[in-house]
Amino acid sequence: MTEEQKYLFDLQGYIVLKDVVPSSAVEACNKSLDRFEDMPPEDFPSPLCLGTPKTEKEIYISNILEADAAFNFLIDIPEVLSVVQGVTCGSYRLNHTYTIYRWAGGYSGLHGHNIPISYKCQYHCRNGEMVSTLTKAVFPLMDCDVEDGCFAGIPGSHKSNFIRPWGGHPDENPVFAPIPANAGDAIIFTCLLYTS
């Protein structure tokens, strides 16, 4: 992890790594995901299951890594692991995998942060090292710009010591910011960051 990456992650609570997944891997993942878009959830191969009820605006499928070997590429990308190791102080594990399909009008309410204190998810820095005990890597499999409903969050909120004064809908939060990324990029963030 570079010094610039450390600074940006600590400042914002996230960083975007550009072009870390080759187009062939993106295509293979998308081809696999296409099978599940219209498949009834009861027909998903085990252990795939819905993470939340399916709606006309969203499908959330848990355990997607087990769906196809195409997703194995996403496990050990050196550039991603360098950042994960840097923000976790070297101790990390793959906890869970999922995919979210989202269409026009779909969104997730803001989630994350540490008030009241969540002992499973902490972020702190000491002696030039940072520890983010719950860190995620998101891999957009299509270009997601601002108008496309890209990943978004409240930069720096992972270090806030006060309760957010606005509601849970992204539109209710004036400091909420889009985090655009393209297919092949990776967004790495601490789960203390308010995201949607």
Residue ranges and their predicted role:
Residues 106-180:
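Catalytic core of non-heme Fe(II) oxygenases with the double-stranded beta-helix
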Residues 154, 189-190:
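Generic beta-strand/beta-sheet core signal
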Residues 1-12, 18-126:
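Non-heme Fe(II)-dependent double-stranded beta-helix
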Residues 181, 191:
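Active-site-adjacent structural elements that line small-molecule/cofactor binding pockets in enzymes
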Residues 194-195:
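Conserved small/polar residues in nucleotide/adenosyl-binding loops
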